[in-house]
Amino acid sequence: MASRLLRGAGTLAAQALRARGPSGAAAMRSMASGGGVPTDEEQATGLEREIMLAAKKGLDPYNVLAPKGASGTREDPNLVPSISNKRIVGCICEEDNTSVVWFWLHKGEAQRCPRCGAHYKLVPQQLAH
């Protein structure tokens, strides 16, 4: 048992010595090109990068962000984007409600939630692709 511990300690010491540079100082490795930890913008690739760049411009091409709530009245309905003529919508009605009221929303005039009376309106949206 003791020999196994000594062998392990010797291996760790050898690795530490190999990690040191020729001057005896520990070699430094940089994570980012400028040194330090890279930012999210430097590290993001693919779809994540596209979303971050669009968010800087104030856009949400993939509907990642929560929709902006309106007052829900007939004059100022909640706008629901859709690529078709109808879409199923879920209304929570009240903050502490534990169930969701689902109903179909069709293109045209604003429609009301059957339970709470909040108004929703379907608006056309193009795909980001």
Curated annotation (Swiss-Prot):
SUPFAM superfamilies: Rubredoxin-like (SSF57802). GO terms for molecular function: cytochrome-c oxidase activity; metal ion binding. Pathway: Energy metabolism; oxidative phosphorylation. Gene3D superfamilies: Cytochrome c oxidase, subunit Vb. CDD domains: Cyt_c_Oxidase_Vb (cd00924). It is found in: Mitochondrion inner membrane. This is Cytochrome c oxidase subunit 5B, mitochondrial. The lineage of its organism: Eukaryota, Metazoa, Chordata, Craniata, Vertebrata. The gene is COX5B.
